[in-house]
């Protein structure tokens, strides 16, 4: 709603597997492109696909499948800086334009008790890296360098800038 007053959400049914040959910095863009291309119906429509991945070092952290995986992710992020990459694919008039936005997030040290309490909310299981900065996951954040909305999952300022170049 920040960019468009009206839009239609078409969920993608793609498998979110990332080929091992893809650089972790481009993984989100790869998935965003797959999503956008899977839902485009007409050549003259505007389609925006996006995907977010979290990396700790060279390790890509997707959405945790269970408590064990979530616990491992949050322990890995505890007390460290990690990177959040959101890839965006814009399809317009049969052409595709892609970009990736990066934001660095530093977590404070998180206790095992805090991790268990957070997992019990159910919040972390549908989010890359096992946390949502827009929810209770914000309680773990010590600092952020970059676009907050990128960590939420859509870098709206950059998207607006890129759309103006493409559509106008």
Where in this protein do the model-derived segments appear?
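Short loop/helix-cap segments at secondary-structure boundaries that form the rim of catalytic
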Residues: 1-2, 19, 41-42
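N-terminal G-site helix/loop of the GST-like fold
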Residues: 1-10, 166-168
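Short glycine-rich, Thr/Ser-proximal phosphate-binding strand/loop in the N-terminal lobe
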Residues: 5-19, 96-102
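Anionic-ligand binding patches
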Residues: 22-168
């Amino acid at each position: 709603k920040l960019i468009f007053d009206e839009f239609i959400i078409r969920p993608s049914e793609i498998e979110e597997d990332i080929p091992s040959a893809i650089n972790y910095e481009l993984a989100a863009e790869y998935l965003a492109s797959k999503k956008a291309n899977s839902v485009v119906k007409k050549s003259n429509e505007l389609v925006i696909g996006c995907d977010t991945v979290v990396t700790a070092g060279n390790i890509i952290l997707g959405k945790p499948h269970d408590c064990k995986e979530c616990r491992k992710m949050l322990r890995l992020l505890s007390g460290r800086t990690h990177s959040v990459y959101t890839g965006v694919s814009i399809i317009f008039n049969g052409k595709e334009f892609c970009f990736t936005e990066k934001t660095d997030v530093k977590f404070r040290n998180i206790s095992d008790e805090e991790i268990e309490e957070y997992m019990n909310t159910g919040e972390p299981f549908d989010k890359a890296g096992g946390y949502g900065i827009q929810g209770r996951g914000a309680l773990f954040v010590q600092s952020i360098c970059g676009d907050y909305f990128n960590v939420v999952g859509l870098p709206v300022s950059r998207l607006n800038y890129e759309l103006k170049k493409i559509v106008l």
